């Protein structure tokens, strides 16, 4: 039989609502870093979303508090084709971590001022790493394709959601209800794939 400790999953705090909704019936008790009492600084110096997710998951899994747990960590961001894939893996740090997303979003819109409609393509990418107690680590990637909107719209979501337009829905991801966004989001897609290995 599996001990309760082995059925715990430790996750970084920032996306807990979405994670708990999607992994609700996966058979694990889902615990955030904060709930587990884990407070460590992690240097994300990978060159890809996958590398950064692995760095985070591995660092957390080595803490005493995460011993015996499966650790999930993600790295995600926005890739804008007209900006050569920027902000990419630097999405959170782009233009400074303390710069409000309202300003970052406007900077992206401004950068695309001369872009033709077909040049406004972009995608949200999420890589999730699962670090297991035996030391193995696996990753899964989720992607959602869209366009950069001409102006921000919507009150839901966070970060770049107000400028990420989904043509098939006629809305930005910030205009979608959270439960609808979770069904199609890059993180949701990556989480659905990672479920298969849990």
Model regions and ranges:
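Anionic-ligand binding patches
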Residues: 14-198
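Single conserved hydrophobic/aromatic residue that forms the stacking wall/gate
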Residues: 1-7, 11
